Amino acid sequence: MAAQINPSILSADFARLADEAKAVEGADWLHVDVMDNHFVPNLTLGVPVVESLARATDTPLDCHLMIEAPDRWAPQYVEAGAGSVTFHAEAAAAPVRLAREIRAKGARASMALKPATPVEPYEDLLPELDMLLIMTVEPGFGGQAFLDIMLPKIRRTRELIKKHGLELWLQVDGGVSAATIERCADAGADVFVAGSAVYGASDPAEAVRALRTQADAATAEASWSCDH
C-alpha cells in the first residue's frame, strides 16, 4: 500500500478550519484530534465541528478520540461524518464491541495505544480493526518531539500484522516530520499523521506530497515490505 499522509488539524488555524482543510486536499485523510480534558490534559473540538468539516472538505475525516467513555461517544462521530474513528485501548470498556459498532455504522474502526501501552495483549483483537495507531508522543498536545523508543513497538506490530495475514493499516502519530518519517516507514508504519510538518510549511499541499514521497521510498527499501 502506498503511504498515506493525514495532516492533523490540531496544528491548523482553528479560525480558518474550512480553508485549512482545503489547503491539504491532496492528502489521504484529514486527522481530527478530539480531546475532552479528562483522558488527556487538553480540550479541542467535538461533534459539531466534525459535522462542519465533513461538509467543508472532500477529504475523508480520520477522527482520533482522546476521550473517556469512547464506547458512548464514538458512534456519534461516525454519524457526524467521520470515515475512520480511533478510540484508545486505555479508555474503551469493550473494544471489540465498539470496533464492530463503528464498522456497522459504515466507518473504519481503529484503536490507539499510548506510548507505555504494549501491543501484545491486543494481538487477538487486531482482526476486529481496520487500523492500529501507535502514539509516538504522549497524547494531548501537538508539536512534541518524536519518541525513537517507539520504533521497536512499530516493528513488533508490523510483525503481528504479517503473522496473522491482516490487511490492517498501521498509523503513527506524534513528531512525524521529514526528519522522522523514513524511520517510521522502515519500522512498518504506512499511515502517517503530520501536524506542524504540514501546517507549519509555506505550502502545506507540497509538504504532504514530499512526506508521501519520502515514506514511499523508505517503504520500498524496508525489509517488512519485500514480500508484499
Curated annotation (Swiss-Prot):
Q: Which family does it belong to?
A: Belongs to the ribulose-phosphate 3-epimerase family.
Under the cellular component aspect of Gene Ontology, which terms does the record hold?
A: cytosol
Q: Which cofactor does it need?
A: a divalent metal cation
Tell me the protein's name: Ribulose-phosphate 3-epimerase
What organism does the record attribute this protein to? Streptomyces coelicolor (strain ATCC BAA-471 / A3(2) / M145)
State the InterPro entries in the record: Aldolase_TIM, Ribul_P_3_epim, Ribul_P_3_epim-like, RibuloseP-bd_barrel
Q: In which pathway does it act?
A: Carbohydrate degradation
The enzyme's E.C. designation: 5.1.3.1
Q: Which gene encodes it?
A: rpe
Q: Does the keyword section mention Metal-binding? A: yes
KW Metal-binding (keyword) present: yes
Catalytic positions are D33 (proton acceptor), D173 (proton donor)
Q: Which UniProt keywords apply?
A: Carbohydrate metabolism, Isomerase, Metal-binding
- NCBIfam families cross-referenced by the UniProt entry: PRK05581.1-4, rpe
What the record notes about the co-factor is: Binds 1 divalent metal cation per subunit.
Q: Which residues of this UniProt protein bind a divalent metal cation?
A: H31, D33, H64, D173
